[in-house]
């Protein structure tokens, strides 16, 4: 009986912490910037974005006719 109560307590505690983390991530605004100084390569794009804005770089193609572009997604506060 005691083990199940302790287990339930920890599960509720962990779920509460997860909800707080998710809410914090949703409140944080995301900005984006096209990094034109490099050709789009997955490693290059991500490395430059991380160095420049502490963000996540991805190669994207907005329309089928466009070339791949390096887009940097980062928290607006940085």
Curated annotation (Swiss-Prot):
Record keywords, A-Z: Antimicrobial, Disulfide bond, Fungicide, Plant defense, Secreted, Signal
UniProt signal peptide: 1-24
Name of the protein in question: Defensin-like protein 141
UniProt xrefs under InterPro entries: DEFL
Disulfide bonds listed in the record: 31-76, 40-59, 45-70, 49-72
Family membership: Belongs to the DEFL family.
Annotated compartments: Secreted
UniProt keyword Transmembrane helix present: no
Provenance organism: Arabidopsis thaliana (Mouse-ear cress)
Gene Ontology, cellular component aspect: extracellular region
Secreted keyword on record: yes
GO biological process assignments: defense response to fungus; killing of cells of another organism
One Pfam family per UniProt: SLR1-BP
């Amino acid at each position: 009986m005691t083990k199940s109560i302790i287990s339930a307590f920890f599960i509720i505690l962990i779920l509460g912490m997860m909800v707080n983390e998710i809410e914090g991530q949703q409140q944080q605004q995301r900005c984006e910037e096209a990094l034109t100084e490099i050709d789009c390569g997955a490693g290059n794009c991500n490395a430059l974005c991380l160095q420049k804005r502490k963000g996540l770089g991805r190669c994207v193609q907005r329309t089928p006719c466009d070339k791949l572009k390096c887009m940097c997604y980062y928290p607006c506060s940085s």
